């Protein structure tokens, strides 16, 4: 079972496609809950989360503190962190499930995963941003927060969760380390 945690800040429009991409996972019983960790938005972010059946947590605390609090409140053994506007490709939840099952078989495994950057499956016609993302991955530039993060809750807790301070999402990826981050076969893109 998986809990999705979505970081938001004035995200009423970008939250909708992110949530829509998670519906297949919820209907298949793989996604148990969605938590929206909001920075105190004054737009309709809370209403969008409510209509979608998400748990809404609002705090003006730094991003790392909000994400860590949301993770602590989950009931699932696996966490998936996404930014508002991050849209999983069809099959994304199934790819996440395969990774979770494989990792769970290796008891005590300390691995995490990110979704493939846009364009990684289509090397013949990538746009400039997709090409840059592919080069970054190929040259060891590592994962970026726009790719989401899939991690076992016990591993997340052992790492101390997201740190406080600037760029908490990138900091947790660095803390995990490139060698312990797998890239899923399914991708994620930022909705425009």
Briefly describe each language-model feature range:
Residues 44, 64, 82-99:
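Acidic donor-binding/catalytic loop of UDP-sugar-dependent glycosyltransferases
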Residues 79:
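Short aromatic/hydrophobic "clamp" motif used to bind/position activated sugar donors
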Residues 1-3, 33:
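Cell-envelope/extracellular polymer assembly enzymes that use nucleotide-activated donors
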Residues 111-123, 133-151, 157-158:
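A recurrent flexible, glycine/aromatic-enriched loop bordering the glycosyltransferase active site
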Residues 38-46:
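A conserved acidic beta->alpha catalytic loop
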Residues 59-74:
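Glycine-rich, basic loop-to-helix element that forms the pyrophosphate-binding segment
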Residues 10-26:
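Short, well-formed alpha-helical segments that are part of the catalytic scaffolds
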Residues 91-124:
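Conserved donor NDP-sugar-binding/catalytic core segment of glycosyltransferases
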């Amino acid at each position: 079972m998986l809990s999705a945690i979505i970081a938001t800040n004035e995200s009423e429009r970008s939250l909708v496609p992110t949530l829509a991409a998670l519906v297949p996972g919820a209907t298949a019983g793989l996604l148990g809950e969605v938590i929206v960790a909001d920075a105190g938005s004054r737009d309709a972010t809370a209403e969008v989360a409510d209509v979608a059946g998400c748990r809404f947590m609002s705090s003006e605390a730094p991003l790392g503190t909000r994400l860590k609090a949301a993770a602590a409140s989950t009931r699932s053994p696996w966490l998936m962190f996404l930014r508002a506007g991050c849209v999983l490709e069809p099959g994304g939840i199934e790819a996440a499930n395969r990774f979770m099952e494989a990792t769970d078989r290796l008891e005590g495994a300390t691995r995490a995963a990110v979704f493939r950057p846009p364009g990684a499956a289509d090397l013949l016609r990538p746009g400039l941003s997709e090409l840059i993302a592919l080069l970054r991955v190929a040259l060891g530039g590592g994962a970026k927060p726009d790719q989401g993060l899939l991690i076992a809750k016990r591993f997340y807790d052992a790492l101390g969760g997201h740190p406080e301070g600037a760029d908490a999402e990138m900091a947790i990826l660095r803390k995990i380390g490139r060698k312990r981050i797998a890239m899923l076969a399914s991708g994620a893109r930022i909705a425009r």
